[in-house]
Swiss-Prot record:
<dbReference type="InterPro" id="IPR001557">
    <property type="entry name" value="L-lactate/malate_DH"/>
</dbReference>
<dbReference type="Pfam" id="PF02866">
    <property type="entry name" value="Ldh_1_C"/>
</dbReference>
<protein>
    <recommendedName>
        <fullName>Malate dehydrogenase</fullName>
        <ecNumber>1.1.1.37</ecNumber>
    </recommendedName>
</protein>
<dbReference type="InterPro" id="IPR011275">
    <property type="entry name" value="Malate_DH_type3"/>
</dbReference>
<dbReference type="GO" id="GO:0030060">
    <property type="term" value="F:L-malate dehydrogenase (NAD+) activity"/>
</dbReference>
<comment type="function">
    <text>Catalyzes the reversible oxidation of malate to oxaloacetate.</text>
</comment>
<feature type="binding site">
    <location>
        <position position="83"/>
    </location>
    <ligand>
        <name>substrate</name>
    </ligand>
</feature>
<feature type="binding site">
    <location>
        <position position="96"/>
    </location>
    <ligand>
        <name>NAD(+)</name>
    </ligand>
</feature>
<feature type="binding site">
    <location>
        <position position="121"/>
    </location>
    <ligand>
        <name>substrate</name>
    </ligand>
</feature>
<feature type="binding site">
    <location>
        <position position="34"/>
    </location>
    <ligand>
        <name>NAD(+)</name>
    </ligand>
</feature>
<feature type="binding site">
    <location>
        <position position="89"/>
    </location>
    <ligand>
        <name>substrate</name>
    </ligand>
</feature>
<feature type="active site" description="Proton acceptor">
    <location>
        <position position="176"/>
    </location>
</feature>
<dbReference type="GO" id="GO:0006099">
    <property type="term" value="P:tricarboxylic acid cycle"/>
</dbReference>
<dbReference type="GO" id="GO:0004459">
    <property type="term" value="F:L-lactate dehydrogenase activity"/>
</dbReference>
<dbReference type="InterPro" id="IPR036291">
    <property type="entry name" value="NAD(P)-bd_dom_sf"/>
</dbReference>
<feature type="binding site">
    <location>
        <begin position="119"/>
        <end position="121"/>
    </location>
    <ligand>
        <name>NAD(+)</name>
    </ligand>
</feature>
<dbReference type="InterPro" id="IPR015955">
    <property type="entry name" value="Lactate_DH/Glyco_Ohase_4_C"/>
</dbReference>
Amino acid sequence: MARKKIALIGGGQIGGTLALLAGLKELGDVVIFDIAEGLPQGKALDLAQTGPVEGYNTALSGANDYKGIKGADVVIVTAGVPRKPGMSRDDLLGINLKVMKQVGEGIAKYAPNAFVVCITNPLDAMVWALRQFSGLPHNKVVGMAGVLDSGRFRLFLAEEFGVSVEDVTAFVLGGHGDTMVPLPRYSTVAGIPLPDLVKMGWTTKEKLDKIIQRTRDGGAEIVGLLKTGSAFYAPAASGIQMAEAYLKDQKRVLPCAAYINGQYGVKDMYVGVPVVIGAGGVERIVEIDLNGSEKKQFMNSVNAVKGLVDACKKIDPAVAKGAAPAKKAAKKK
């Protein structure tokens, strides 16, 4: 049986951490792609030399040509630039939209059968653009946001209650940004919903509101502390969790930026919702019941994402049309 192949587009902090985690978990052989000559090759060599120490047998390589990702089973995209001081939203969109065009065309040509996870920001708009430029099926292209945001929410709740993070379940709906919607009503500690824990005196609504706001500001908090960078360990771990669910057909229920067309009253959009990820990619959209307040917050988040997508269409009108459906490569015998 042929080993799986994982292609990482972008050799920065997240890309390098993704490669290490893929190696440690032995999910498959890894190729790191980056336009900077020597960078992906150097990181791949360093990580390959880590194998004998850590005890993994993953083959790692670097590439500066999209041919290197040929036949990949999973592609994780981190390429692009972060938002810098003085940079407008449209500036960031313009730069990363061009990157998504190049990446999407590369995936369509060399890895049309892949399951694609996008991590590039602004996430919800970039995963939409990547799907448009690649022409891959909607169920095979997803954005990593909710797993990370939910992980942050779970950590803050576990710290508040003094319990293990393993006993805390929580998820976040909506876009990856200020308008994300953490849902206390659907979040639990050992099966006990957060509103009940408030009634039991474990915390207060005011403290819970602060935790929710801290979750929304999770990325900015890390940027403020680092000063010269942004989060990369947790984003990489989140991306690997999604890739592993696909490669091992785990049927994991994970919050992701997925394509919805009618669910939640939203049409033709990528936005954060709980989904089932298995060998078929996104196999099901989990449509939970939202009360009036939750629905209002969710639609506010959807509208914020729509604003980003509309801005992308103005910057590059061709993205609205999208690419022709990617031609699937012949299956290996």
